[in-house]
Curated annotation (Swiss-Prot):
Alphabetically ordered keywords of this record: ANK repeat, Repeat
Keyword Repeat among UniProt keywords: yes
Protein name: Putative ankyrin repeat protein R580
Organism per entry: Acanthamoeba polyphaga mimivirus (APMV)
ANK repeat extents: 12-41, 189-218, 249-278, 336-365, 367-393, 394-423
């Protein structure tokens, strides 16, 4: 008695003629029971375009596991047929029902098997729309496969076109989306695509859609203003009245223009007649390369920020030192300086922080010992100490937090500057245990830490931190 199996391989580890597996090849083949799967099933479920399928006759006493565990058992089998997937004639003798043909075509699309697709695309049972949806959704499918499918059926219903175009845009298959739109120029599809292109900052696609009749609105233009894309904005404004844009969305427009951080964008819309006032400082992108020149334009127009605003706080931690120098000259109130100093130190912009201190910011403005506003890290603590931060007010709080969170380098520099900590015994036990486990692997088994007093634990922690 005997039975039939299929062997599937996709590489050079297996010799289909002699049924021999090279070293390491055992894990690169599949052995399929023919009673469970037909040949076409094996192809669709297990094969790639580069695969081959060997139909073998196997003695009844051999199982699949025995064949995989000991490749020498394959010598007891007989090759009945070999099917190479890259040989198009393999499929000629197959009986392909409607559902099977559909599955095979999906397999061909996913494997970029262009010749096989061409063989069957004229079949009346093939739905090009379904194959396109399958191909577009799979990032491994090449554009030339999708273009082939489109060449067989260019025209779709409006809802079908919208679905395919949306899929293309989500998968960033822009050229295929353009082709679909050119063949199926439904106004609703074009307009919805422009919504997507604008929100996704796809300038090239947006221009294509405008050229193909898309209706432009304020939101489309605002999207490209926000990213500083002046070319696309000007192109759209050739088809949309500038004054209408200014009148319809003045507040959103001013915010978008200044948030773009683009000098050219700001100058362009000021020249168009956009009205501006001191509120533009709230929207300005302070980390832009153009910020310095933008501020000079505002100064030339005698537009200044309010002295009690958050402008300095919002800008100081991200702007260049040159921009900061201009802002400081606006004479903000003391609270603005102090809040800006906190945000700048916490952001690690220490040069800017030094300039704020030089200009009048107070590093000790917060005299509440239970509320330190600064982040705990070594560079920040060092900066505070170097600039006469009052450790008597906040030092103990910062040291406690440093120890409890394992910031031992911060704790060390604070201890070196005379700061004492104030913690409960349970907190001291946790700190000591964590330190020992981190730096020594374990606590000395001969030491009963629970029997130690708080003072004894403090001394041990001091010694460990200083000698770390």
């Amino acid at each position: 008695m005997s039975k039939t199996y299929y062997i599937i391989s996709t590489n050079d580890y297996f010799d289909p003629i002699n049924l021999s597996i090279k070293d390491g090849g055992e894990k690169t083949i599949d052995i399929i029971d023919c009673e469970r799967y037909t040949l076409i099933d094996c192809i669709i479920f297990f094969c790639k375009k580069e695969s081959f399928v060997i139909e073998i006759i196997v003695p009844d006493f051999l199982t699949k596991d025995k064949l995989l565990c000991d490749s020498e058992n394959l010598s007891l089998c007989v090759v009945n047929n070999i099917y190479y997937m890259n040989d198009i004639s393999v499929f000629d003798s197959m009986s392909l029902e409607k559902s099977t043909l559909k599955s095979l075509m999906n397999w061909a699309v996913k494997n970029n098997y262009k010749v096989l697709l061409q063989k069957y695309l004229d079949n009346q049972n093939i739905k090009i729309y379904d194959l396109l949806a399958c191909g577009i959704s799979n990032s491994n499918v090449c554009d030339n496969i999708l273009e082939l499918l489109l060449s067989y059926c260019k025209y779709f219903q409006e809802n079908e076109t919208m679905f395919l175009v949306s899929f293309c845009l989500e998968m960033h298959r822009i050229d295929i989306a353009k082709t679909l739109i050119m063949y199926n120029s439904y106004p609703s599809v074009i307009n919805k695509s422009l919504n997507f292109a604008s929100k996704s900052n796809m300038s090239e696609l947006a221009i294509f859609l405008v050229d193909n009749g898309a209706e432009i609105n304020c939101d489309h233009i605002l999207c490209f203003i926000r990213i500083g894309d002046i070319d696309t904005v000007l192109y759209m404004l050739c088809r949309y009245d500038v004054q209408k844009l200014i009148d319809r969305c003045h507040f959103d427009l001013v915010e978008a223009v200044f948030n773009s951080g683009s000098l050219e964008m700001i100058e362009t819309f000021i020249d168009f007649g956009m009205k501006i006032n001191s509120k533009v400082y709230q929207h300005l992108k302070y980390d832009s390369k153009d910020t310095y020149e933008i501020l000079r334009i505002l100064l030339a127009r005698e537009i200044y920020p309010r002295k009690c605003s958050d402008v300095l706080k919002n800008a100081a931690h991200i702007c260049s030192i040159d921009v900061l120098k201009i802002l400081v000259d606006f004479e903000f109130n003391q609270k603005s300086f102090d809040n800006a100093l906190v945000s700048t130190i916490n952001a690690g912009k220490f040069k800017n922080a030094e300039y704020l201190l030089f200009s009048g910011a107070n590093i000790n403005f917060n005299n509440m010992p239970t509320n330190c506003m600064f982040k705990i890290n070594f560079q920040t603590i060092k900066f505070l100490i170097d600039n006469n931060f009052d450790l008597e007010i906040h030092g103990t709080l910062i040291l406690n937090k440093s120890l409890l969170n394992g910031y031992y380098d911060c704790a060390n520099i604070l201890i070196e500057n005379g700061v004492k900590f104030s913690l409960t015994k349970s907190e001291l036990l946790k700190i000591y245990s964590d330190f020992q486990n981190t730096h020594h692997g374990q606590i000395d088994p001969e030491l009963n830490i629970n029997s130690l007093t708080s003072d004894e634990l403090e001394n041990l922690i001091y010694i460990d931190i200083v000698n770390k």
